[in-house]
Amino acid sequence: MSRTEPAPAPHEDALQAAARHAPALHSISLRIPATHPPRRGVFISFEGGDGAGKSTQMRMLRDHLVTERSVAEDLILTTREPGGTPLGESIRELLLHGEHVEPRAEALLYAADRAHHIATVVRPHLARGGLVLGDRYLDSSVAYQGAGRELSPEEIAGLSLWAVDGLLPHRTILLDVPTSALDERRGPAGKDRLESAGLEFHEAVREEFLELARADPERYAVIDGTRPREEVHAEVLASVAEVLSLFDPTFEPVPPPRHRDEQ
């Protein structure tokens, strides 16, 4: 049986635009079409440096949807990378708190975590019509492992897109905060391995995030994360309004199929 060719991805134009600024994502997209989630599921990711406020803004968005828009709590999945599954949490501990990991091994560990997380958690929730709010996604790998390490963004983008079978969020919120301000927010105590890297590393990461956003303005919303969190929250709401129109908050998720041995 011949294999059916995938339909052109709705995000194709944005990826073509990325060729001018981020050849990594563009070159890989020629071989792995980036595909959006199913029509009734919505995927929103939050990106930025450590301490930019991603977790806070993700939680505020979730609370707003539940209290102000009456979205059922079980329709909203909040998750994080690395992590999000028992396997992922083990990988997270190794990556963030373990000993030195060689760059290629580090990239492969992040990709393994993401592949398992997307296949077992994110895609099933999207397929049931749910809303996924993610604290970091593959953009973080391109920024941290690509710009800040010894590997190129092209290599990291290719590995990351392969791991998730081309899945991209409907909207990516980039909370941009100057590197020096992030360092002050984190403080000297309790830093993990990545947070303890020098200012030069984190500046390279920030610049790569901004480059990715410039290359893909349809997916990205860049928000000044230095402002009061309520102001940032208001801009987050405005930036996700369009993609949330794809999400029907009255839709009841279809239960996942039962295994034969459960019937």
Predicted regions and their residues:
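Conserved lysine of the Walker
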Residues: K54
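ATP-dependent small-molecule kinase phosphotransfer cores
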Residues: E68-V164, E235
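Walker A (P-loop) phosphate-binding loop of P-loop NTPases
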Residues: G51
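Hydrophobic positions on the alpha1 helix immediately C-terminal to the Walker A/P-loop
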Residues: Q57
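Pre-Walker A (Motif I) flank of P-loop NTPase domains
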Residues: R39-F43
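NTP-dependent small-molecule kinase module
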Residues: S2-P37, M60-R62, S180-Q263
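Hydrophobic anchor at the beta1->P-loop junction of P-loop NTPases
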Residues: F46
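A glycine- and Lys/Arg-enriched "phosphate-lid" helix/loop adjacent to the NTP-binding pocket
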Residues: S140-E208
